Amino acid sequence: MDLGAHFDREGAKLALEKFIQDRVNESKDAKETSVDNVVVHEVDRQASNRREWKLAALSGSEVVPEEVAFRLHGVLAKINLAPGEIAHLNAYKASSLTQRVQLVGLGSHAFDDMLLNTKVVTDILRRHLGGQHSPVWKIGEGYGDLQMNCSCLYLTKAFNRPEKEVPFGPGVDPFKKFARYKPQGYIHTAANVVKYFKRVDEEGKRVLYECFPGTFRVGNIVEVQGSVIAFPVKDGMVKMVFQMNTLILEDASFSKAAEHARAREYNPPQRPMQLKRKSWYEEEDEDMEVGGARRKFKDLRLETAHSYVG
């Protein structure tokens, strides 16, 4: 879905710039991991036979079990989320069923800098893998500037040592469509979970509330949390993807304004139709006692009512 001609791109860009700068200021006091302390950690995926690598942080001489988390902020340019995305599933594409979004900055320098800084992951992987693999980090272009795709598979193919199956989150599988893939060995694990939130201002505080994936619209300003995963592909290459685990709605005002503008264009306001009051009688006899006739109708209704009651 396109942002459309009614979307205030300049306003959204400026709002995104301010939002990213505010998040940077908030994180200055937070504990950050130096690039020198980041190492590549091979993931032990029990439900998959594919090799995967993630980033982990060093604490002294040991690797902290928590992976290095990333936070990205941008404007939603494309959405592929439940329930619309899974309303008509193809039974032969279970391995590619993905919840994903695409972020753009609409020319925001803060957004471009944020994405370019993530390329440091390529250097870290290259040092770890040496000449064995060549990492590929693809950041495309959309709407004239950089874009980032963030995704997470709905299902995992279970092999010899299946992971624990977990229930789907609120609004993710309302039609119970994924049950058909369980006989094929596909399950929903903790690695497939994406949590959806919207941030609300309450008494000067920003509070998170869980929401359905169907809440999100193209044009929303969002925060995506997740990790970078690398895995080998053909010809000795390593593909890197941003696997999201949290999507937060921060600002929906620009998408709502665009929707209202489109609605006004296709449904312009119309003048209310003037109705003329028409008499019950085509012609009134001058000798007719209208008041008496009305009294007769009134008495008739009362008599009828009494007859039913009696």
What are these regions (language model features)?
Residues 173-247:
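Extended serine/threonine-enriched, polar tracts that run as long, contiguous segments within proteins
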Residues 1-180, 235-283, 294-310:
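OB-fold ssDNA-binding interfaces and closely related basic DNA-contact patches used
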Residues 289-293:
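Acidic, serine/threonine-rich low-complexity intrinsically disordered regions
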